[in-house]
Amino acid sequence: MGHVIAVSGKGGVGKTTLCGLLIQYLCENGKHPVLAVDADANANLNEVLGVKPEITLGELREEIERAGVDPRYQIPTGITKQAYLEMRLSDAIAEEDDYDLMVMGRTQGQGCYCFVNGLVQTQVQKLQSHYPYIVVDNEAGMEHISRGILPMMEVAILVSDCSRRGVQAAGRIAKLMNELNFKPQKTGLIVNRVPDGKLDAGTLEEIRNQGLELLGVVPHDDQVYQYDCDGKPIIRLPKDSPVRSALGEIVKKLGL
């Protein structure tokens, strides 16, 4: 069975960037194929990886829901909605050389995400035996944790920036996992965008207050910002990038 790694944290702390670089590290070190899952309704892991999915699970939901009502969405005659869904799910996985990407995406209007969340859960369970590693970029906050979407995760990586709010958000996610009796083999914190790669006393104190294990820090790097501004996939950062080097050391520590 594949090892499930869940990456979570407050919005805006760079968790998706680190998630993409983690996928890259695993692929470059012979841990492929990796199944990358963008479980954030505000999907952008594909941009970090430089991949364009054919269809997201959210779009697939809309296609199924509106079939027979909206002329743009038609299910072939003689096929049930469930059978059509199963047939189309393979189109929701973008295949690359060393990894595949599945994107949750958003639904239109006021539609509930329960169906799409359920698809994420069932697909991860179904595909787990086909990949040595499954890396899930979770929605900002605690949505998938609270709904039990990923009870099978083995490693929970919490990401924060240097702010107290970011660390506190990571602490709340860790506490919620404990309350829901989720028992990853490893749970720890990565602090991202750290000036000069050194944490100040206030941030270290907050990490201790939250009872979090610090896996490591990733330094601030203007090159990441520039790549983002230029629309370049972050995984194209040079190998000697401080961000890639720091994350690589953290992954080695995790024994992945």
Task: Describe every region a protein language model picked out.
Residues 4, 33-35, 99-101, 133-135, ...:
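Residue-level preference for the first positions of well-ordered beta-strands
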